[in-house]
Every structure is written in structure tokens, then in C-alpha cells.
UniProtKB/Swiss-Prot annotation:
Highest classification ranks of the organism: Bacteria, Bacillati, Bacillota, Clostridia, Eubacteriales
Keyword match Acetylation: no
Residues binding ATP, per UniProt: 232-239
Keywords assigned by UniProt, alphabetized: ATP synthesis, ATP-binding, Hydrogen ion transport, Ion transport, Nucleotide-binding, Translocase, Transport
Function: Produces ATP from ADP in the presence of a proton gradient across the membrane. The V-type alpha chain is a catalytic subunit.
PANTHER family named among the record's database cross-references: H(+)-TRANSPORTING TWO-SECTOR ATPASE, V-TYPE PROTON ATPASE CATALYTIC SUBUNIT A
Name assigned to this protein: V-type ATP synthase alpha chain
Pfam family, one: ATP-synt_ab_Xtn
GO BP, sorted A to Z: proton motive force-driven plasma membrane ATP synthesis
EC code(s) of this entry: 7.1.2.2
Superkingdom of origin organism: Bacteria
Length: 591
């Protein structure tokens, strides 16, 4: 270990000399208290260090000790249901060690619990040949997560010894005989956060990650292994969209990174998730969740680390063969941390003061999402879906963070302040948002939900776009200038907006909608349009069509529970009989 000396302190940036043996991205201990920092720049024997803790009280002349290791996370049983800070220190253990409700300086705690024993069940046996990624056994971590213990990267050989029983994360569970001698394996492995975990090959995402949110699943789906951005101004509902996707998203593991946002939002997650039941397993949502909290009052430098810590944990579960989603709320705060460090390093600023490498750093993060075949004999398939919130100042999506993000991701859920002020939630603007996975996801929906899913979706989207065009005419010359056919289109588009796209996150039946229910709801609304068109052709007045009692039942169909979904078929039958009755009574042609 090499010791240097501090010559400059500037907020979270510390410059030390005598560091000629250190490397970029080495972890260092700064000052007498041993604050954790990371070298981000070397100039001769001078190292620029970003410190992940509060630097008040540190001054020139204090020692800096290099560890010679990159910033790494501990991966093993104990991750699920835990809450970490940006550099993977468990907040509950931290609070006990520091005896304080706030982050104290220089407190060292292990990421994974060293006392807790986990029941290890071997699946490999003595004499088996193993290499990186092969599963040698399992630990039932929670009721829903079976933690597969994998051979670490770089280890290849024959199992010499393997034990069953209860072990902590540091005890030896197996010995592998390699060309370089015997290698002891434990339940835990370490991995540097800035380096993506290796895999056998990448796959094309073909399956949608269903979220139970109608506007997302029907109109702007994201694939398992895809990347999505949620930009929007303050108060438009970014965090609620992220929470909804984290709660109801069709993934087996959720990693939620609160990066520079309010502490109360992480408290909401901690309060709500344990009480909510996963619709697939019936267990608490917390039993599949890892939380990383790096709130706005925590050290700025740790925001950058928190994003990498989160994606590394997500990749670890992906390698086990799980589908994982990672929520980053918000990447703008992370970019602001980059901007602050860049300014203190006196680098040449780019757009709006952000560093020139903002785009490549964002790409480093989002490109670690994807669907892959993991290393190992059994060819496990896993996926990481990355969903990042972006908070552009004033909702201006032409600013650098949003633009750099949109160049990388394939799904854009644009939140609209005007919709939010009208109390339309989720406030995703259907005219500006897009999904480049639409065609592939449409094929999957046609094959697995209903063969006319794509046709219904296209028809509904065309109606919404036509409504926007007709609204211009209505503003100029009024509703009376429109033909009955156009007025019907406006009424159906209004029904799509209010009865389908609008969704109440706090209503037990409306907060989550299965794909089957989504199809039946959209089919009901568009069937009303088709039947009404037949009635208009037969000479029935539009006012009579719009006053049909069945319209109220269609509007309230969103509140039908998943168990009583067959009631929608009854509404469809009622709709057809009421329309046929109107047509038989006749209208303008019989007058």
C-alpha cells in the first residue's frame, strides 16, 4: 500500500501527491478517518480523488493510502430486501455502527452480513469440471428468489471438495482444482462496478416487459432487455411511473436506485413495497427488491457510484437467469454530479456546463442493459431492463442529458405537465412518446394475447392523432361544423383517453391491468365505434347513440377486477343488442 499526501481539498475533490504507484479508478482511504475515495485522474505523481463521504475537516498534509483495488461490490446472498447507500454500505448496519440516523464519516461496514448463515444446497459434485458461470449450488434467499451460486469469472478446473449445510458468505463451500493450484469458493464474489459482467452472447429482445400500465403496454411497450427513458418536468409523475413499473413490472428482480432525489420517495418505497403483493407469486414485493438510496443530501460524488453499483447487482442476477429491471431516479442528478466533478477538475465544459464525455458515460450505463445467454453450461437466459428518469429543468427536453439519453434508448415515455395539471395520470403524452420495439412486441402480443391486438392498437392510435387534428377545427369553428362521423371519432377518442389511458395508481383494481383485460377494454371501446358507425349508416341520430346506457358500463369497465373479467364479454353482448335495437327503431331515414 502506497501512502501519499493531500495538497488540495475542493469539496468532494481531493488532490494528493506521491501517488505514482496508484492507478486510475483505484480505491483510496483519505485522511486520518480513512474516508473512501476513488482516483479519477492521474497527472505525474499527483492523483485527483473523488471522495464518497463528506470532506469537511480534511486538509493539506493529511495521508492518502491506496488499496490497489477498483471500487467493487460484494455479490452474494443478502442482497435482496436490503437497502444500501451509493457505495454498497447497508444503511441499517451503518446506523448501528455509527449510532446515528445520519451518515457519519469514516465508518466502515461490510456490504453483506457476515454473521448470517445461509442453507447451501450443492447441485454439482466432486469430480465435475466447472468454469466461469457454472452453477455449483443454490441458496433459498427469500420465498421467491432462489440464489444460484456461480463459479467466479477466471476460475476453471475440477471440483475437489463441495459441502452442503449452513454457511456465512465468507466460509468455504467448495474447492476447485485449477492449473494454478486449488481455489476456494465462497457464497460471495466481488466485482468492479465500472466493468460490465461478461456473458456468452447477446440476444435480440422479443418479449415485452409488461407493467400493468395500459398506456405503456398497449402503445409504448418496452422489451425485456430494453432501455427506456422517462423525461418530464417537476410534478409530472416520473417517480410514480417508476414506482408503478417497479411494483407491477413482469420481472423477477427489481433494483431501485434513488439517485439524488428526495429521501421521502425512498421512504415511500420502504413503506409500500412490503405491504404490496406480487400478482404472480402472492408474496411481498420487497422479497424481490434491492434498494440503493443516494438521496439529495448525501455526498454528491456517491451519486455516480450508485448508478454503477445498481447495474452491477442487476447484471449479477441476470447471470443467474433472472429477468431484472433497474430503475434509476434520476439520471439528471447523476449528470449534475458529473458536472460538479468536471468543474472542480477544471475540464473544458460542453453543452450547459456538462462534461464533453456525458454522452459516453450515459451510453456506458444503458448499454449494460440487454437480454443475454449467461456464461455456464446450462445456457441460462437473463435480461436487464433499464428505465431511467430524466428531470430536465423546466421540462425542456432539448437539454443535453435528455438528448444524450434519447440517442441511446429505444423507448421514450414523455411526461406532459399539461396532462398532469388536468389530473390525467400517467401523464405520458401519446402524441410525442414512442417505442422502437413496437413491431416486435406487436408480433408477440398477436401470438400470445389476441391475434388482432396490433390492429386494435393501430386503430386506437390513429383515432387519437385524428382527434388532435379535429380539435384545431373545433377551436376555430365549433363542434357543430363537424359531420356526425367526425363527432363520433371525437367521442371515441375521448373514451380512449379517459377510460383507457387514464389510470388510478391508488385504486386496487385499476392500479394493475393484465394484458387480457387491456385487450378486452380496448376491444369494447372500438367495438362501440364500429357498432355506432353501423347505426349512423342506418340513419340513427348520433345523440341517441351517445345516450346509450351501455356507455357508462364501458367507462367503468376499468374497475372490474381480474377475477370478474368475463363481465366484459357481457358488456359487449349488451352493446350489440342495444345498437341493434336502435337500428331496428330506425332514425332519420324513417322519419
Amino acid at each position: 500500500m502506497k501512502t501519499g499526501k493531500i495538497i488540495k481539498v475542493s469539496g468532494p475533490l481531493v488532490v494528493a501527491e506521491g501517488m505514482d504507484e496508484a492507478n486510475v479508478y483505484d480505491v483510496v482511504k483519505v485522511g486520518e478517518k480513512g474516508l473512501i475515495g476513488e482516483i479519477i485522474e492521474m497527472r505525474g505523481d499527483k492523483a485527483s480523488i473523488q471522495v464518497y463521504e463528506e470532506t469537511s475537516g480534511i486538509g493539506p498534509g493529511d495521508p492518502v493510502i491506496t488499496t490497489g483495488e477498483p471500487l467493487s461490490v460484494e455479490l452474494g446472498p443478502g442482497l435482496i430486501e436490503s437497502m444500501f447507500d451509493g457505495i454498497q454500505r447497508p444503511l441499517d448496519a451503518f446506523m448501528k455502527a455509527a449510532n446515528s440516523a445520519f451518515l457519519s464519516k469514516g465508518v466502515e461496514v461490510k456490504s453483506l452480513n457476515r454473521e448470517k448463515k445461509w442453507p447451501f444446497v450443492p447441485t454439482a459434485k466432486v469430480g465435475d469440471k466447472v468454469s466461469a458461470g457454472d452453477v455449483i449450488g443454490t441458496v433459498q434467499e427469500t420465498a421467491v428468489v432462489l440464489h444460484r451460486i456461480m463459479v467466479p469469472f477466471g476460475v476453471e478446473g475440477t471440483i475437489k471438495e463441495i459441502k452442503a449445510g449452513d454457511f456465512n458468505v465468507e466460509e468455504v463451500i467448495a474447492v476447485v482444482e485449477t492449473e494454478k493450484g486449488d481455489k476456494n469458493l465462497t457464497l460471495m464474489q466481488k466485482w468492479p462496478v465500472r466493468k460490465g459482467r461478461p456473458y456468452a452472447r447477446k440476444l435480440n429482445p422479443v418479449e415485452p416487459m409488461t407493467t400493468g400500465q395500459r398506456v405503456i403496454d398497449t402503445f409504448f411497450p418496452v422489451a425485456k432487455g430494453g432501455a427506456a427513458a422517462v423525461p418530464g418536468p417537476f410534478g409530472a409523475g416520473k417517480t410514480v411511473v417508476q414506482h408503478q413499473v417497479a411494483k407491477w413490472g413482469d420481472t423477477e428482480i427489481v433494483v431501485y436506485v434513488g439517485c439524488g432525489e428526495r429521501g421521502n420517495e425512498m421512504t415511500d418505497v420502504l413503506n409500500e413495497f412490503p405491504e404490496l403483493k406480487d400478482p404472480k407469486t402472492g408474496e411481498s414485493l420487497m422479497k424481490r427488491t434491492v434498494l440503493i438510496a443516494n438521496t439529495s443530501n448525501m455526498p454528491v460524488a456517491a451519486r455516480e457510484a450508485s448508478i454503477y453499483t445498481g447495474i452491477t447487482i442487476a447484471e449479477y442476477f441476470r447471470d443467474m437467469g433472472y429477468s431484472v429491471s433497474i430503475m434509476a431516479d434520476s439520471t439528471s442528478r447523476w449528470a449534475e454530479a458529473l458536472r460538479e466533478m468536471s468543474g472542480r477538475l477544471e475540464e473544458m465544459p460542453g453543452d450547459e456546463g456538462y462534461p464533453a464525455y456525458l454522452g459516453s458515460r450515459l451510453a456506458d450505463y444503458y448499454e449494460r442493459a440487454g437480454k443475454v445467454v449467461a456464461l455456464g453450461k446450462d445456457g441460462r437466459e437473463g435480461a436487464v431492463t433499464a428505465i431511467g428518469a430524466v428531470s430536465p429543468p423546466g421540462g425542456d427536453i432539448s437539454e443535453p442529458v435528455t438528448q444524450s439519453t434519447l440517442r441511446i434508448v429505444k423507448v421514450f415515455w414523455g411526461l406532459d405537465a399539461q396532462l398532469a395539471y388536468k389530473r390525467h395520470f400517467p401523464s405520458i403524452n401519446w402524441l410525442t412518446s414512442y417505442s422502437l420495439y413496437l413491431e416486435k412486441m406487436g408480433e408477440w402480443m398477436d401470438a400470445h394475447v389476441a391475434d388482432d391486438w396490433s390492429a386494435l392498437r393501430t386503430e386506437a392510435m390513429a383515432l387519437l392523432q385524428e382527434e388532435a387534428n379535429l380539435e384545431e377545427i373545433v377551436r376555430l369553428v365549433g363542434m357543430d361544423a363537424l359531420s356526425e362521423g367526425d363527432r363520433l371519432k371525437l367521442e371515441v377518442a375521448k373514451s380512449i383517453r379517459e377510460d383507457y389511458l387514464q389510470q388510478n395508481a391508488f385504486h386496487e383494481n385499476d392500479t394493475y391491468t393484465s394484458l387480457n383485460k387491456q385487450y378486452k377494454m380496448l376491444n369494447l371501446i372500438l367495438s362501440f365505434k364500429h357498432e355506432a358507425e353501423k347505426a349512423l349508416e342506418a340513419g340513427v341520430y348520433l345523440d341517441k347513440v351517445l345516450k346509450l346506457p351501455v356507455r357508462d358500463r364501458i367507462a367503468r369497465s376499468k374497475y372490474i377486477s381480474e377475477e370478474e373479467i368475463s363481465k366484459m364479454d357481457d358488456i359487449l353482448v349488451e352493446l350489440k343488442s342495444e345498437m341493434n335495437k336502435l337500428i331496428s327503431e330506425g332514425g332519420v331515414l324513417n322519419a
